[in-house]
């Protein structure tokens, strides 16, 4: 199991194929994604890598984090995230990952925070049918109807589908396809839509329900390796 990547969602566009058909894609940007720290079995009880995204202004970094970044000699990062990895996939702090970490056509899992929609009714939140348009129904056309049973059990059960807060939660979309990779500009283009608003952070991993395709870089595709192969 190798590390994933952290990226920022730029929005959606489309790519044109040679036959003229087009594919809707979501554009993700990798901005100086570096390994900041590692977790080892001996010290932490598990193996993982901590990745940092972007470059933060020093005034926005706490003293504790300044010391953390100084210890590993990495510029302060805007966002930190941790990926569990196998013992043979641990990377050295300071290594910069490339968009070529994923291959065109590869299936990936993308995790993001869905758009918050505020307080929503049962029809929008749970796709309920609502009540009758007439036949004695008034005012309650979009309500969810009864929530309980009778004197026994005499309560509304926990997790009953009702009106409430919709969105703004962690969502993972599985088995989406990598449509295009632009390593020079640090862009990943994923076929279709993925969770989250423009400007939000997303995590991209190898699909857990698919075998890792042949030819992917292991333990990771680093920018120095990509530059050497282009040269």
Curated annotation (Swiss-Prot):
Which protein are we looking at? Large ribosomal subunit protein uL3
Q: Which residues carry this modification: N5-methylglutamine?
A: 151
- Indicate the quaternary assembly: Part of the 50S ribosomal subunit. Forms a cluster with proteins L14 and L19.
Post-translational modification, briefly? Methylated by PrmB.
The family line of this record is:
Belongs to the universal ribosomal protein uL3 family.
What keywords were assigned to this record?
Answer: Methylation, Ribonucleoprotein, Ribosomal protein, RNA-binding, rRNA-binding
As recorded in Swiss-Prot or TrEMBL, the protein's gene is named: rplC
Function, as annotated, reads: One of the primary rRNA binding proteins, it binds directly near the 3'-end of the 23S rRNA, where it nucleates assembly of the 50S subunit.
Q: Name one GO cellular component term.
A: cytosolic large ribosomal subunit
Q: Which GO terms describe its biological process?
A: translation
Classify the source by domain of life: Bacteria
Single GO molecular function: structural constituent of ribosome
Q: Which Gene3D superfamilies match?
A: 3.30.160.810, Translation factors
Naturally occurring in which organism (per UniProt)? Granulibacter bethesdensis (strain ATCC BAA-1260 / CGDNIH1)
